[in-house]
A protein has these predicted regions:
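Autoinhibitory propeptides
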Residues: 31-42, 114-194, 536
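Extracellular S/T/G-rich loop segment that most often corresponds to the catalytic His/Ser-adjacent loop
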Residues: 208, 325-400
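Short coil-to-beta strand junction motifs in C2/discoidin
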Residues: 496-509
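C-terminal subdomain of the subtilisin-like protease fold in secreted/lumenal serine endopeptidases
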Residues: 284, 400-479, 524-538, 579-581
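Short acidic, glycine-rich surface-loop motifs adjacent to enzyme active sites
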Residues: 275-297, 314-316, 488
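Primarily auto-inhibitory N-terminal propeptides
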Residues: 24-123, 165-167
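C-terminal edge strands of extracellular/lumenal beta-sandwich accessory domains
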Residues: 411-414, 473, 501-503, 514-516, ...
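Subtilisin-like serine protease catalytic core
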Residues: 190-268, 281, 292-293, 306-309, ...
Length: 581
């Protein structure tokens, strides 16, 4: 028999259980999505953890009035560059080629993206952009709307069949922090005076958190254009003006190149498409999030590089002495990541980022990152922000010499890597790169030598159901000299993701074989971690003078084609073990 006390206790327990059940349901509604929806929503963070938890994202959201979202639509990725072949010899040929690629991309993506946008009530977003050339929609949304009814908006978007992924951008972006001091370090001035190369006919795009001051005296008589439209309130910044000056001012690397400047607002697709519509050959990015994570931005830049045959050069970041985290842009496997050396080219600056969380190696190369006196700007600068435009300027000079390099980004990266030197006896990793310096410190003299005296190649390797050799070519090397061979092959994006597993990187090997004896004198890429990288450096002392066959092959079958870039050079070792002049 129940006493009144027992009944009261039962009632109290029941009430407590009801309260707890309500709290649980509230928590579940707020922080638990169905598995189908949860798999399609990614909160991208800014620390070493690739994604933030719902608790962490809420703290960040509550501190922001608006937040960026990057929506991947549910359609197949295509690579226009693999679908359209054209001989390119002149700058006019390049423009015709790029227009054809954009038309292919537009026909495949634009209407499907519009259909997807119509299903998600795009009118509630600010700064919305529907991509013409890739499977993305980007927008900004008021934080209050995003969090309303326990993230009902996110759940609604992710539940649509036309949507593949929704990325909530909670990252912190920052710019990665006269000119002749640094240029002397790469042996540029003397070669510029004797060769006369100025980057003429080359178009450089620049993506920054700000735009250039078009009226700055450094751009007098130059083609220096900033996107200025009423619906994008872009801000002129000294950082953007400084980066551009390194490339195209009279004292810059490529003074006759044209430059197009755009401010990075939300997700990068709208800004990059504006640059593509200017027919740029190179995109310099001295900005990003230093997280060491491969994220949706990394995947996007990887895709654009190969799909539209444009070289993307990115600052590695300035976190070297704070944790080492690489910029998310520079994490792209098809992106040319640039670290910072000192202005004397004797070593890598301590601030230069080098750490990645996916096992790949970055940076690709290093260039001077200090010794910059910013004429007509009124400040000094240092860091990888100023290293990247040196490489972009050198690429413009190379493209002026050989216009076909404009549409061969893998070849251009291979050449840059082969043109590097490093006189400090640090250990290389299994792919032939130094931990902090990548392939080494850039030399313009070496770059010209490769372009004019050594063979370098760009080829498309078809999809194959077999393993083994996919590319072979003969090079002639001299006994006693050091041979440096650089190879890089394209990574193909199959979906945007915060995981590098979204990028298909074929597992490949590189052998160097003596053509006369058949002996393998150097081999790389046979280890269990070969799948982590899409680039190798082979560096060895040549045993005998003669022909050597470079053999590049796959260790596994694959269903997609690759672009391969190969470059090589030889040099003599000085008595102290450094590279002789």
């Amino acid at each position: 028999m129940f006493t009144s006390l027992k009944i009261n206790r039962i009632i109290c327990i029941y009430v407590v259980l009801l309260v707890l059940f309500g709290v649980f349901n509230s928590f579940k509604s707020k922080y638990y999505f169905t598995s189908e929806v949860a798999d399609k929503i990614v909160f991208e963070g800014h620390d070493k953890t690739s994604n933030l938890s719902y608790f962490e994202i809420e703290e960040i959201l509550e501190a922001e009035e608006q937040i960026s979202i990057f929506i991947e639509t549910n359609q197949s990725y295509i690579y226009p560059s693999l679908m359209y072949e054209q001989e390119v010899e002149t700058n006019e040929d390049v423009i015709e080629y790029r227009e054809a690629l954009k038309e292919i991309g537009r026909e495949h993506y634009f209407l499907s993206n519009i259909h997807a946008a119509s299903s998600i009530e795009l009118n509630i977003f600010g700064d919305a952009h529907i991509s013409q050339y890739s499977p993305y929609i980007s927008a900004k949304v008021d934080t209050e709307i995003l969090m309303k009814n326990n993230y009902e908006l996110l759940k609604s978007i992710a539940s649509k069949a036309s949507i593949a992924k929704v990325f909530v951008k909670a990252d912190e972006k920052e710019n990665q922090n006269f000119i002749s001091t640094a240029i002397d370090g790469i042996e540029f001035t003397n070669y510029q005076n004797t060769t006369g190369y100025t980057g003429s006919g080359i178009r450089i795009g620049m993506l920054e958190y700000g735009i250039i001051d078009e009226d700055n005296a450094n751009f007098d008589g130059k083609t220096a254009v900033a996107r200025t439209v009423w619906y994008f309130p872009e801000t002129v910044t000294p950082h953007a003006t400084s980066v551009a000056s390194i490339m195209i001012s009279d004292e810059g690397i490529a003074p006759d190149a044209s430059l197009y400047s755009v401010e990075w607002f939300n997700s990068p697709d709208g800004e990059i498409e504006w640059l593509l519509d200017q027919n740029v050959d190179i995109i310099n990015i001295s900005a990003g999030t230093s997280s060491a994570n491969y994220d949706s931005d990394s995947a996007y830049f990887d895709y654009i590089t190969i799909a539209y045959s444009v070289l993307i050069v990115a600052a590695a970041g300035n976190e070297g002495d704070l944790g080492g985290e690489m910029s998310n842009v520079a994490m792209g496997k098809n992106v040319l990541a640039v670290g910072a050396s000192d202005s004397e080219q004797t070593g890598v600056m301590m601030l230069s980022s080098y750490l990645t969380n996916n096992g790949d190696h970055k940076p690709n190369v290093c260039a001077p990152g200090d010794g910059f006196d910013m004429m007509n700007i009124g400040e000094t600068g240092f860091g990888t922000s100023f290293s990247a435009p040196i490489i972009s300027g050198l690429a413009a000079v190379a493209m002026e010499i050989y216009p076909y390099l404009k549409i061969q980004p893998m070849r251009m990266i291979a050449i840059m890597q082969a043109a590097c030197f490093y006189d400090i006896d640090f250990t290389k990793n299994e792919w032939g790169f130094y931990e902090y310096a990548g392939a080494g410190l850039i030399s313009f003299a070496n770059l010209l030598e490769i372009l004019n005296y050594y063979d370098n190649y760009h080829t498309q390797i078809p999809a194959s159901s077999t393993r083994g050799s996919m590319y072979e070519n003969l090079f002639t090397f001299t006994a006693g000299k050091v041979c440096k061979i650089s190879v890089i092959w394209s990574a193909m994006v199959s979906s945007a993701s915060s995981s590098p597993s979204s990028v298909q990187t074929n597992v490949c090997y590189l052998n160097v074989v003596n053509e006369t004896t058949g002996a393998v004198v150097f081999s790389i890429g046979t280890s269990s971690t070969a799948y982590l990288s899409n680039k190798y450096i082979a560096e060895f002392v040549v045993p005998t003078t003669g022909d050597y066959r470079i053999v590049f092959g796959r260790l596994e079958t694959n269903s997609h084609a690759d672009y391969l870039g190969v470059a090589a050079r030889q040099y003599t070792l000085a008595d102290d073990g450094t590279e002789a002049d």
